[in-house]
Amino acid sequence: MNVPDFEKLAKLAHSNDIPLIVDNTLGAAGAIIKPIDYGADVVVHSATKWIGGHGTSIGGIIIDAGTFNWGNGKFPLFTEPSEGYHGLVHWDVSGFESDLCKALGIPSDKNIAFGIRARFEVLRDYGAALSPFNSFLFIQGLETLSLRVERHSEN
């Protein structure tokens, strides 16, 4: 498997004020590589393939490093009022050093804007939430993740 130079890609993306978003499906849900450690801003995983491991549930995971400045002027969905939330401006509420971040103990160099917007708007509009049973199945799959990754890596 060829692993991209995430640090170089992150530097290029950040020099242009855009986030580095990585599909880490082949990274075995972070068991093989953790792109955030190399500068990725957002990482997505297929929970179906590695976390579940048995094809019994369909799901995915979005992980936000909390490091990207979504308020840099290039992402109006974060910096302009949201009609669906009575004019809420996501960046004002959940950007660096926002009252919400302070209340939650988020370090001043981190933000939760991407995660908050995903929960507030995407979850509301598309309903992408796991059922309790599917969550249980994924937790069961996690119990054998390290063994499965070890065996796949040996093969």
Question: What does each of the following model-derived ranges do?
Answer:
Residues 1-155:
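Conserved PLP-enzyme active-site core in the AAT-like
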